């Protein structure tokens, strides 16, 4: 049974697990890990098949969540960015006793556009899947460029993401494909109505992958949750607005 790459930093009395997004790895958190590890016991994770967590093929969302849980602390705040938000949400649904609070960042319970639901057009996701087999490095780079588009610091934010990707070997194509399949098919809108723990949802106003129109829709669907929109951020608010981002998490810690 393979273990995933897992790094623990800091001595805080509350555990915080950070789960990265599609195509990336835990190096994406280096812009905030020093600050967060001064407040939390921080856990940095490479999701199965990504970064240093080699030896995994494409997994379903449920299987990915179970693999991550095997090495996790008994109880933690779980924070997931983008695809990682679905993994953290799945853990909150299946093992609520392990989750002090759930935080999703630039994430949607249903990334794919549906009837009366804004999201990524299914043919765009299918196009990414098709292009992966042709030129997967270029496809990943295009996806990263989408994530920072529109922000004042778009160029340097995109460079930071690209550096994260290139710092480690690229994931296998089937792992990348499996991640896109999760983004294309999973819909947790209804299940997440009933999660019992504090639930904080963070968004970028300029996000091209998770449209801000979903925010009031989810405020209504999940009245027990809280939402916050970074006015000048896109898909990676922790890179463009690290201080504001960390401040929100430290404030959440006081409430759990």
From Swiss-Prot:
Please name the GO terms that the record assigns under molecular function: pimelyl-[acyl-carrier protein] methyl ester esterase activity
Question: What EC number(s) does the entry state?
Answer: 3.1.1.85
Keyword hit for tRNA-binding: no
Give the catalysed reaction(s), semicolon-separated. 6-carboxyhexanoyl-[ACP] methyl ester + H2O = 6-carboxyhexanoyl-[ACP] + methanol + H(+)
**Which biological process terms from the Gene Ontology are attached to this UniProt entry?**
biotin biosynthetic process
> Under which main EC class is this enzyme filed?
hydrolase
**Pfam families on file:** Abhydrolase_1
Family indicated by similarity: Belongs to the AB hydrolase superfamily. Carboxylesterase BioH family.
Q: How does it assemble?
A: Monomer.
Stored NCBIfam families: bioH, PRK10349.1
Q: What is this protein called?
A: Pimeloyl-[acyl-carrier protein] methyl ester esterase
Source organism per entry reads Escherichia coli O6:H1 (strain CFT073 / ATCC 700928 / UPEC)
